[in-house]
From Swiss-Prot:
PANTHER family to which the protein is assigned, alphabetical: ANTITERMINATION NUSB DOMAIN-CONTAINING PROTEIN, N UTILIZATION SUBSTANCE PROTEIN B-RELATED
GO process terms (BP): DNA-templated transcription termination; transcription antitermination
Family: Belongs to the NusB family.
One CC-aspect GO term: cytosol
Task performed by this protein: Involved in transcription antitermination. Required for transcription of ribosomal RNA (rRNA) genes. Binds specifically to the boxA antiterminator sequence of the ribosomal RNA (rrn) operons.
Protein name: Transcription antitermination protein NusB
Key words, A-Z: RNA-binding, Transcription, Transcription antitermination, Transcription regulation
Gene Ontology MF term list: RNA binding
């Protein structure tokens, strides 16, 4: 099955955001290294950059809107789940042209690829509660 350019952008953004979170390097350094080292064919590059930069620029706001819907402390969250939730939180809050069902479904699919066995269920549960709070349902 062919993966859409936006899905590829989301998958790559999650990988780059994870690298940023773990390495504590600047997002500019992470982006440069990522696009140099990874196969970016089939990626919606403008959307990749928008997701990457937008998530980092708004990370405190995103963390604040996610926090009430988490069942554990921030430092107890799996880093990949945290990264996927941040990206989806960015899309739900700031990318209003993306239907909320699409943002949630894409996050679930990305969690199936990169998360642990039940990550997609956790991501779905959190985002399903967040969307109405952002008036996206």
């Amino acid at each position: 099955m062919k993966v859409s350019p936006r899905r590829r952008a989301r998958e790559c953004a999650v990988q780059a955001l994870y690298s940023w979170y773990i390495s504590q390097n600047s997002i500019e350094q992470v982006e440069l290294a990522f696009v140099t080292d990874q196969d970016m064919q089939g990626v919606d590059m403008p959307y990749f950059r928008k997701l990457l930069r937008g998530t980092v620029e708004n990370v405190d706001v995103i963390d604040d809107i996610l926090r009430p819907y988490l069942d554990r402390a921030d430092n107890e969250l799996d880093p990949i789940e945290r990264t996927i939730l941040r990206l989806a939180g960015y899309e739900l809050k700031f990318e209003l042209d993306v239907p909320y069902k699409v943002a949630i479904n894409e996050a679930i699919e990305v969690a199936k690829v990169f998360g642990s066995d039940d990550s997609h269920k956790y991501v779905n549960g959190v985002l399903d509660k967040l969307a109405p709070a952002l008036n996206r349902k």
